[in-house]
UniProtKB/Swiss-Prot annotation:
It is an enzyme of class 2 (transferase). Optimum pH is 6.25. Keywords: Glycosyltransferase, Transferase. Its EC number is 2.4.1.-. UDP-alpha-D-glucose binds at residues 285, 350-351, 368-376, 390-393. It comes from the Eukaryota. The lineage of its organism: Eukaryota, Viridiplantae, Streptophyta, Embryophyta, Tracheophyta. This is UDP-glycosyltransferase 71K2. It comes from Pyrus communis (Pear). Belongs to the UDP-glycosyltransferase family. The gene is UGT71K2. GO terms for molecular function: UDP-glucosyltransferase activity. Transmembrane segments: none annotated.
């Protein structure tokens, strides 16, 4: 039997790259005919992911990385004020280099005695411009969406609305009825790019989805039954493969800036806490707060009386990753550290999120509602309180709280950089609510965690979906069997 090569083009950010590599590992584990080539687009901004990709390359001989050369003409950093437009232009600037690399791969496979064929190009949300390369080289293209089925429904709906009436979204506009999402969606929870006056780039991305051979989504049928059922009955939508949860169970590798001593300090402190007694606060790789908001969070935690583990990070210049706080006493209320740190709570910088959510002492999660974080919390049965920041997190928070009933609603429409300060009393209520021992939300989350684990096992819905994707790529229809 002939072997096949799948070429993945992920976005360089951790939230996109890590699940892409985990899915690649899942594919090679399932079928020994598959090898994976990752075209590594370098991040415009400094990251800590190089050691993670090196560890994958060293441990997985059928996954290799090819670095895409940096283009000479890159979009200016000021454009990062509109991330969707910035990333789209940055990725588009890579197209000539990517085309050259893939052309060489196709040529090499055609001349190789090993009978390895380039079977498909798998692109990220921000890399849909690479679909043109696949078309030119007559290679099927697939989209790997690191977000969820509800977000996919939203993106598929955007071009339809735009064709009827040029979109100019205001937060005060009427709610939208979106096929695949149960409740009408208020524009205030739309992805930030659509409500900041710069939505054309977002619509351009969404308009390419239907050009692919199929769409792989990091979700599972049991979690998003409504949306996935709709996709399966709409002939105008490419086949959808719900393959999740695709999560990294060893997230320490992905963030080498977390030193072992800090990890050990965190886990040792958790080991000393009662079961399900700690609320974990973490807001993603780009989540941070100004000093006045930090003080309110601290006061809310103290008022709640709950034990807490707080990953506290401070804003950095635009386009760079938030940094750990160098002087906690400057941003926290007077005496807060003396009263709480190491006793009722622990404040840290970057934290091993998966390991913390898996710990028996963790009972709740105050989260930015990034999709990877949501999947990790469901996997470990830890309920979330919503505090979205950016990207599609507001939509995620809305659906988790209002549609799925698996999160407690604190804020749904908060946006990073907002002048709005969430007060201590509101934070106190949210923390106390998420830590309630016998809440309906906790019961639902724990039950969905069990379903998530079944979904990825042999006989599960996502296991079957991965098999269907493999068959569609290398089976009879693609001519590589």
């Amino acid at each position: 039997m002939k072997k096949v090569e799948l070429v993945f083009i992920p976005s360089p950010g951790a939230g996109h790259l890590v699940p892409t590599l985990q899915f690649a590992k899942r594919l090679i584990d399932r079928n020994d005919r598959i090898s994976i080539t990752i075209l590594a687009i370098q991040s415009y901004f400094p990251t800590t992911l190089s050691s993670y990709t090196k560890s994958i390359a060293a441990s997985e001989p059928r996954i290799r990385f090819i670095d895409v050369p940096q283009p000479q003409d890159r979009p200016p950093q000021e454009m990062y004020k509109s991330p969707a437009k910035f990333f789209s232009l940055y990725i588009e600037s890579q197209v000539p280099s990517v085309k050259k690399i893939i052309t060489n791969l196709v040529s090499s496979s055609a001349n190789s005695s090993d009978s390895i064929r380039v079977a498909a190009l798998v692109v990220d949300l921000f890399c849909v411009s690479m679909i043109d390369v696949a078309k030119e080289l007559n290679i099927p293209s697939y989209l790997f969406l690191t977000s969820n089925a509800g977000y996919l429904a939203f993106m598929l709906h955007l071009p339809i609305v735009n064709e009827k009436n040029q979109i100019a979204v205001e937060e005060s506009d009427p709610e939208w009825s979106i096929p695949g999402i149960v409740h009408p969606v208020p524009p205030r929870v739309f992805p930030v790019a659509l409500t900041d006056g710069r939505c054309s780039a977002y619509i351009k991305l969404a308009s390419r989805f239907r050009e692919t051979r199929g769409i792989i989504v990091n979700t599972f049928v049991e979690l998003e039954t409504h949306a996935i059922t709709l996709f399966s009955t709409d002939d105008g939508i490419p086949p959808v493969y719900p393959v999740g949860p695709v999560i990294d169970m060893d997230d320490g590798q992905a963030h080498s800036n977390l030193d072992q001593a800090q990890r050990d300090r965190i886990i040792k402190w958790l080991d000393d806490q009662p079961q399900k007694s700690v609320v974990f606060l973490c807001f993603g790789s780009m989540g941070s707060f100004r000093a006045e908001q930090v003080k309110e969070i601290a006061l809310g935690l103290e008022q709640s009386g709950q034990r807490f583990l707080w990953s506290l990070r401070m804003p950095s210049p635009i386009g760079t990753v938030p940094c750990d706080c160098s002087n906690l006493e400057e941003v926290l209320p007077d005496g807060f550290l003396e009263r709480t740190n190491g006793k009722k709570g622990l404040i840290c910088g970057w934290a091993p999120q998966v390991e913390i959510l898996a710990h028996s002492a963790t009972g709740g999660f105050l989260s930015h509602c990034g999709w990877n974080s949501i999947l990790e919390s469901l996997w470990h049965g830890v309920p979330i309180t919503t505090w979205p920041m950016y990207a599609e997190q507001q939509l995620n928070a809305f659906r988790m709280a209002r549609e799925l009933g698996m999160a407690l609603e604190m804020r749904l429409d908060y946006k990073r950089g907002s002048a709005d300060v969430v007060g201590a009393d509101e934070i106190e209520r949210a923390v106390v609510g998420v830590m309630e021992k016998d809440s309906e939300v906790r019961k639902k989350v724990e039950e969905m965690g069990k379903m998530a684990r079944k979904a990825v096992k042999d006989g599960g819905s996502s296991f079957a979906s991965v098999g269907r994707f493999i068959e569609d790529v290398i089976g009879e229809n693609s001519g590589f069997k």
